[in-house]
Swiss-Prot record:
<dbReference type="GO" id="GO:0005739">
    <property type="term" value="C:mitochondrion"/>
</dbReference>
<dbReference type="GO" id="GO:0030170">
    <property type="term" value="F:pyridoxal phosphate binding"/>
</dbReference>
<dbReference type="InterPro" id="IPR015421">
    <property type="entry name" value="PyrdxlP-dep_Trfase_major"/>
</dbReference>
<keyword id="KW-0663">Pyridoxal phosphate</keyword>
<dbReference type="GO" id="GO:0019464">
    <property type="term" value="P:glycine decarboxylation via glycine cleavage system"/>
</dbReference>
<dbReference type="Pfam" id="PF21478">
    <property type="entry name" value="GcvP2_C"/>
</dbReference>
<keyword id="KW-0496">Mitochondrion</keyword>
<dbReference type="GO" id="GO:0005759">
    <property type="term" value="C:mitochondrial matrix"/>
</dbReference>
<keyword id="KW-0560">Oxidoreductase</keyword>
<dbReference type="InterPro" id="IPR003437">
    <property type="entry name" value="GcvP"/>
</dbReference>
<feature type="modified residue" description="N6-(pyridoxal phosphate)lysine">
    <location>
        <position position="783"/>
    </location>
</feature>
<dbReference type="GO" id="GO:0004375">
    <property type="term" value="F:glycine dehydrogenase (decarboxylating) activity"/>
</dbReference>
<comment type="similarity">
    <text>Belongs to the GcvP family.</text>
</comment>
<dbReference type="InterPro" id="IPR049315">
    <property type="entry name" value="GDC-P_N"/>
</dbReference>
<keyword id="KW-0809">Transit peptide</keyword>
<dbReference type="InterPro" id="IPR049316">
    <property type="entry name" value="GDC-P_C"/>
</dbReference>
<protein>
    <recommendedName>
        <fullName>Putative glycine dehydrogenase (decarboxylating), mitochondrial</fullName>
        <ecNumber>1.4.4.2</ecNumber>
    </recommendedName>
</protein>
Length: 1031
């Protein structure tokens, strides 16, 4: 049956390939569409029939053929176009035998469930949905008033459906191509305005990873800019323990001494000679609110700077840190509609005074203008970033939390300043009401004077109170044996307050106690809610009087209709995977399947506090343990840690683990880290942050590591050699043949090997980093394992380690995790951005080990297919001895500057006119384009992209031949937005039609850039990073 089906479709497939190209160039026939569908049906039917060989009633919704773009027939065509008859012969020429793992050693994943003897090799989509629901049900959804930076929220459904669950928002990449990213950039400008307004400071970045790492970034920024070169950071005792743990980790690599104390003006005066900055929590960890104005003034008199970790919702009614003199404010936007997700992801915020605007870490959105003099947004001051500063950088921040930042901005837009203030007032009123009831029943409140949402209560036995709370369906916080804490939030209602009355043996109903208070008011009180009781009024000396969020965007879109239209308006300006492939080299922009995404909004995953007792998070622990099993299986390591919130954070974590291990064996003097010059900028930045001295290793003209230089430097620095960082396949897109030898050299000289897993999409199921010789590696779950990029985050960068390093994996001060000698925390949450781990878990379980191997094969094949097609039009910078690449390749545009006056940037901008996002631009080599198609793109889409680049090459040739001038042509004027072609004046040597419809298919389906080319220099010289406060 299958053979006859294949024969019937062979002619159709041949015709399809021809018609695909005809359709792209304008022959838009219904036949081509039908043939395309026939081709896809063949692929799916093939997969189903193959599955029938092993099952009598196989699932028909298997995931692999939906994830991998080319069908088996397409792949055979690709192989033959490259001169190979099968995958085995192709892979033999791509991957050196010395690093290949025999397939017999990678057959199937086991199970973390001891009762599951024969787990499925892979799950179908419906089977996995059932599995995910069953695992989610292992979590116990008990309402948590634990606080400590994590709170129950009401995520507006309009934001959940239209942003969080919308691929036009979550599949975008970082907005490096500003002309096709204006919607996201505007939203992030809204976010920056929100943060700057609420903190009362001049400027905010576009998000960091979380509150703890934002605190660490602030400390290091102040240290690096202290003119007196002081090295002590004074930290108030009343801060969150997780933030303190992250500060200690960051301080270690920079030689910063942290002094923990109750900060007073007198202490500041006494410590002035050696302290560069101070850190306070506002409100404090126990819930107290202090007036830090005198403290800040004293610090300023000694040229110290003040960092305040703060709560955005509290700042809607409390004096802002900027008002009382803070120089930097950090925190989390979690309270602005972001579910707890067992610890993340949440956007960390960072705002500072004007003094530090050109030193602020992370990405910064600024207003500039385009070629047509219209206002437009862009990434500003990019020379601050780690990929340029490398080992001179004091921050390695790369991936941040763009999607979560955008969601929090929409939350502020939806509620507006008045709505946010209402929410904050209700929380404060509820806390005041509860405090009054507790005190009337004889309880002592530690922070009774001033507070916002948190109370610390003295009790006879904290354990008994927590047990009783649990019986009532609530989690409270144990402070110590005789104190408990609780933090109220926007979800609190009468039922919750009544339950808290019962937990603390207050033998009254909420209504009864309310009436007692209301009738005792000086002038009586007939209010029907708690908000207007005099005991629920914030003291004037703490109450905020300055205005905030006065820009129209925060005062217009309060109905769901208006918000929905605004969200859609913004997303229509941004190109995403919903529109076209995004072939960014080293970024792995693959499919983020809906089935993978569904679990993250399940309340049983979304609404779990990270500090709940372990038995309440068994579902999450299952996901984490299963991911560890699968990741260590495919990498050849022994243990894993999920705390790092990005790939760069994973680098830093892995290197910090190496340092801890070496100190434990008396080798703490080792401080040299060898890094190839081809490495991504985060590598040297991470090494410097971990306290290493970076020594670069040369590369040869063919892109390979210079083994002679490596050996010489390893020998020269043998006594101090700590580590070698290697990316494999290399950042030039090649499987180097000598990698095992290189790693052996490092081990022979006493060093450890750090393996950068940024390019793991070429290796899964084919090579094991641990078997090659690495001691530790990080993985990018937002690349290889399908967590979406979100427009610049979230990300997850777990590290996998060999057994000898496992004892040093990061710990946490609240939740038991990590190694027995674990380093202090690298993120606020014990398991990092746990809320999105189900995405990678879903991908791996639905693909199975064999499916993951097939994905790697497809990624390699797709890259080489495209490289072959483009090689007769552009020079390829590097290939191996067989003229093949790995999963990505580099096109050389350097010659065109001399021949046509255009460069890689011009090609990138012209691609926008073809409705494509550009490849990675000018990295790892200036004036080149690095292309990575991933396994998810179809033959049709890859051919469409190749045809676009080939067409652009012809446009360049016209300049070379004098048919178009060098200073006025299709490329240097690109992109061409609608405003451009609609202008009355047209002084171009090409038609308007050719400018915007260079190929006929674009007349049917085109994504329009919303602005013309940005003026980058103007934006940096005239830095403007917030919306004007005009209503």
């Amino acid at each position: 049956m299958f053979d006859s089906f294949m024969k019937r479709n062979q002619l159709a497939l041949i015709m399809f390939r021809a018609c695909s190209k005809l359709q792209y160039h304008g022959v838009n026939t219904s036949l081509s569409r039908h043939l395309f569908l026939a081709k896809r049906n063949l692929s799916i039917s093939s997969a189903c029939l193959e599955a029938k060989n092993s099952q009598k009633f196989p699932a028909l919704d298997t995931f692999e053929p939906r994830h991998i773009g080319p069908s088996k027939t397409d792949q055979q065509y690709q192989l033959e176009s490259l001169g190979y008859k099968d995958f085995d012969s192709f892979l033999k020429d791509v991957i050196p035998d010395s690093v290949r793992t025999p397939e017999s050693q990678l057959m199937a994943f086991g199970s973390v469930n001891p009762n599951e003897k024969n787990p499925p090799v892979n799950y179908s989509e419906s089977e996995f949905t059932t599995l995910a629901n069953n695992v989610a049900n292992q979590n116990k959804l008990i309402k948590s008033f634990i606080g400590m930076g994590y709170y129950n929220v009401k995520l507006p459904a309009a934001i959940q459906r239209n942003v969080l669950e919308n691929p036009e928002w979550y599949t975008q990449y970082t907005p490096y191509q500003a002309e096709i990213s204006q919607g996201r950039l505007e939203s992030m400008m809204n976010y920056q305005t929100m943060i700057a307004d609420l903190t009362g400071l001049s400027i905010s970045n576009a998000s960091l990873l979380d509150e703890g790492t934002a605190a660490g970034e602030a400390m290091v920024m102040l240290m690096a800019n202290d003119k007196k070169k002081r090295k002590t950071f004074l930290v108030d005792k009343n801060i969150y323990p997780n933030t303190l743990s992250v500060l200690r980790t960051r301080a270690s690599g920079f030689g910063i001494k942290i002094e923990l104390d109750n900060i007073t003006p007198e202490l500041i005066t006494k410590s002035a000679k050696h302290v560069f900055g101070i850190f306070v929590q506002y409100p404090a960890a126990d819930g107290s609110i202090f007036d830090y104005g005198h403290l800040a003034a004293t610090a300023r008199s000694f040229n110290m700077h003040v960092v305040a970790a703060t709560d955005l919702l509290a700042l809607t009614i409390l004096k802002s840190p900027g008002e009382w003199g803070a120089d930097v404010a950090v925190g989390s936007t979690q309270r602005f509609g972001l579910p707890m997700g067992y610890g993340g992801p949440h956007a960390g915020f960072f705002a500072c005074s004007e003094e530090f605007k050109r030193k602020i870490p992370g990405r910064l959105i600024g207003l500039s203008k385009d070629r047509l003099e219209n206002p437009a947004y862009r990434l500003a001051l990019q020379t601050r970033e780690q990929h340029i500063r490398r080992e001179k950088a004091t921050s390695n921040i790369c991936t941040a939390q763009a999607l979560l930042a955008n969601m929090s901005a929409f939350y502020a837009i939806y509620h507006g300043p008045n709505g946010l203030q209402e929410i904050a007032n209700r929380i404060y009123a509820s806390t005041s009401f509860l405090k009054s009831a507790l005190e009337s029943s004889g309880y002592k409140i530690v922070n009774k004077s001033h507070f916002f949402d948190t109370l610390t209560i003295e009790v006879e036995s904290a354990d008994k109170v927590l047990a009783k709370a649990l019986d009532h369906g609530y989690n409270l916080r144990k402070v110590d044996d005789s104190h408990v804490g609780l933090s109220l939030d926007e979800t609190v209602c009468d039922k919750d307050i009544q339950a808290l009355f019962s937990i603390f043996n207050i033998n009254k109903s909420v209504d009864q106690y309310y009436m007692e208070i209301a009738t005792s008011e000086p002038n009586g009180n007939s209010a029907s809610t708690v908000d207007n009781l005099s005991i629920c009024s914030l003291p004037e000396n703490f109450r905020r009087t300055t205005l905030y969020l006065q820009h129209p965007v925060f005062n217009r879109y309060h109905s769901e209709t208006e918000l929905m239209r605004y969200i859609h308006h913004l997303q229509s300006k941004d190109l995403s995977l919903a529109h076209a492939m995004t072939p960014l080299g080293s970024c792995t922009m693959k499919l983020n399947a809906v089935t993978e995404m569904m679990p993250i909004t399940n309340p049983l995953f979304a609404n779990i506090h990270p500090y709940v007792p372990e038995e309440q998070a068994k579902g999450y622990r299952h996901v984490i343990e299963d991911l560890q099993l699968m990741l260590t299986t495919i990498t050849g390591f022994d243990a894993a840690c999920f705390q790092p919130n990005s790939g760069a954070a994973g680098e830093y974590t892995g290197l910090s683990v190496i340092r801890a291990y070496q100190r434990s064996i008396g080798q703490g003097h080792r401080n040299i880290c060898l890094i190839p010059v081809s490495a991504h900028g985060t590598n040297p930045a991470s090494a410097a942050m971990a306290g290493f001295t970076v020594i670069p290793v040369k590369c040869l003209n063919n892109g390979y590591l210079d083994m002679q230089d490596l050996k010489e430097k390893a020998s020269k620095h043998a006594d101090k050699l700590a580590a070698f960082m290697v990316t494999y396949p290399s950042t030039f897109g090649i499987f180097e043949p000598d990698v095992k030898e290189a790693l052996e050299v490092i081990h022979e000289h006493g060093g450890q090997v750090y393996f950068d897993g940024a390019n793991m999409n070429a290796m899964v199921g084919l090579c094991k980093a641990g078997d090659i010789g690495a001691d530790v590696c990080h993985l990018n779950l937002h690349k290889t394992f399908c967590i979406p990029h979100g427009g610049g985050g979230p990300g997850v960068g777990p590290i996998c380690v060999k057994k000898h390093l496992a004892d040093f994996l990061p710990s946490h001060p609240v939740v038991s995790c990590g190694g027995k000698n674990g380093i202090t925390s690298v993120s606020s949450s014990p398991f990092g951005s746990a809320g999105i781990l189900p995405i990678s878990w879903a991908y791996m379980r639905m693909m199975g080990l064999a499916g993951l191997r097939d994905a790697s094969k497809a990624a390699l094949l797709n890259a080489n297919y495209m490289a072959k097609r483009l090689s007769s039009h552009y020079k390829l910078v590097y290939t191996n001895k067989n003229n093949l690449c790995a999963h990505e390749f580099i096109l050389d545009a350097r010659e065109f500057k001399a021949t046509a006056g255009v460069d890689a940037t011009d090609i990138a901008k012209r691609l926008q006119d073809y409705s494509f996002h550009a490849p990675t631009l000018s990295w790892p080599i200036a004036n080149t384009l690095m292309i990575e198609p991933t396994e998810s793109e179809s033959m049709y889409e890859m051919d469409r992209f190749c045809d676009a680049l080939i067409s652009i090459r012809q446009e360049i040739r016209e300049i070379e031949e004098g048919l178009q001038p060098k200073d006025n042509n299709l490329l240097v004027n690109a992109p061409h937005p609608q405003k451009d072609i609609a202008s009355e004046k047209w002084d171009r040597p090409y038609t308007r039609e050719r400018a915007v419809y260079p190929v006929p298919l674009l007349k049917e389906r085109k994504f329009w850039p919303s602005v013309a080319r940005l003026d980058d220099a103007y934006g940096d010289k005239n830095l403007f990073c917030t919306c004007s406060p005009v209503v």
